[in-house]
Amino acid sequence: MLRQTYEDLHRHPELSGEEHRTAALVSSRLRDLGMQVHEGVGGTGVVGVLVNGTGPTVLLRADMDALPVTEDTGLPYTSTVPGVMHACGHDLHVVCLLGAAQELTAIRQAWSGTLVLLFQPAEETVSGAAAMVADGLFDEVPVPDVVLGQH
C-alpha cells in the first residue's frame, strides 16, 4: 500500500500552499490508524496525535509540497500536473512518515508516550512551518520533547 501511495502522490504533486489532495489523503490514513487528526494547520498542514500512556512527546515531520518543474523522467507514474513535480522527494517523505505511523501504531504495546506526526505544507517557499506555529500548532498538540524531521 505504501508504494501505491507514493506513486499516487508522485502523479498528483501540489505546489506550496495548495496541498489539499495530499492533506486529505494523509488525514484519512491517520484516522484509519486511530490517530487524533488536526487539519488546516497553517493552511494545508496536517497533524496526527497518538497518546499512548506517559512518556516523552516525539514529533516526526515530513514536508508535502512539490516544485514548479516539468517532469521528464519517463516513469510510469510521472506527474500528471503540467509544470509541477515532486523533484525533491517530498512525496517519499510523506510515505515514509505514513509508514512510520503504521508501524508505531501496530507496536504501541512496545512504547509509551505521545507521538505527533506533522505533515508540513509550503516547505519550498519557507513559509509552512512558521504558518503552522502562528496558527496555534502548540495550542492544539503537545509541545514535543524531541523533533525528528526529514529533508
Region locations from a protein language model:
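Acidic/histidine-rich catalytic neighborhood of metal-dependent amide-processing enzymes
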Residues: 92-151
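Acidic/His- and Gly-rich active-site-bordering loop/insert found
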Residues: 1-86, 91, 95-112
